[in-house]
UniProtKB/Swiss-Prot annotation:
Transmembrane segments: none annotated. Belongs to the uracil-DNA glycosylase (UDG) superfamily. UNG family. This is Uracil-DNA glycosylase. One of its GO terms (cellular component) is cytoplasm. InterPro entries: UDG_fam1, Ura-DNA_Glyclase_AS, Uracil-DNA_glycosylase-like, Uracil-DNA_glycosylase-like_sf. It catalyses: Hydrolyzes single-stranded DNA or mismatched double-stranded DNA and polynucleotides, releasing free uracil.
Length: 230
């Protein structure tokens, strides 16, 4: 996170977001992160993985957007895709509930791992609205500037991509609905898949079959939600 030319970003995203890297909030965010690293703090995900969501799902390929809040803050978990964990890491509770709903909705076997890279490569943008976090300190990088950047990402998708399904789970994700043109896209809302709330409507929401139905109606390939074994 130094200057625009040194940031590894998929070309479509880099072009669409170029102006953001000169905004005052981005300079402040860079300085905040520089100080965190200089203080010896452990920041997740590792630097090369911060923009994994954008690099794994090129702008022109976005079909679905799933919004998370901030990265997992345990060692070895976060790799830049919301809800996803690196191979070899136990599946987190919210993702377990996502798998349960996938099984109920589409009879997809529950995966033995939590690595969602294959979704990202099919056009599912797995975006945390805050893209970094300090180890063992949830929401430690909230309100430091990331939200301006990720709000712009949501707007860019709404403006430039046709027929996208936005899955907004929980109040935080639903607060972003104002950034989305509901006349062009499908917005599906539910409570968060966290064990604290999933039983209040996430389990039973049918979002995955509804997503694929929407895509197929528009002549687009559905998402294969079944994860390959590692």
């Amino acid at each position: 996170m130094t200057d625009d030319d040194r940031i590894k970003l998929e070309p479509g995203w880099k072009n669409a977001l170029r102006a953001e890297f000169d905004q005052p909030y981005m300079h402040q965010l860079r300085e905040f992160l520089r100080q965190e690293y200089a203080a010896g703090k452990e920041i997740y995900p590792p630097g090369p993985m911060i923009f994994n969501a954008l690099n794994s799902t090129p702008l022109e390929q976005v079909k679905v957007v799933i919004l998370g809040q901030d990265p997992y803050h345990g060692p070895g978990q976060a790799h830049g895709l919301c809800f996803s964990v690196q191979p070899g890491v136990p599946t987190p509770p919210s993702l377990v509930n996502i798998y349960k709903e996938l099984h109920r909705d589409l009879n997809i076997p529950i995966a033995s791992h939590g690595y969602l890279q294959s979704w990202a490569e099919q056009g599912v943008l797995l975006l945390n609205t805050t893209m970094t976090v300090e180890r063992a300190n949830a929401a430690s990088h909230a309100k430091k500037g990331w939200e301006f950047f990720t709000d712009r990402i949501i707007q860019v998708v709404s403006e430039q991509c046709p027929n996208v399904v936005f899955l907004l789970w929980g109040a935080h994700a639903q607060s972003k609905q104002k950034l989305i043109d509901g006349t062009k896209h499908l917005v599906l809302k539910s409570v968060h898949p966290s064990p604290l709330s999933a039983y209040r409507g996430f389990l039973g929401c049918g979002h995955f079959s509804r997503t694929n139905g929407f895509l197929e109606q528009r002549g687009l390939a559905p998402i294969n939600w079944a994860l390959p074994p590692l």
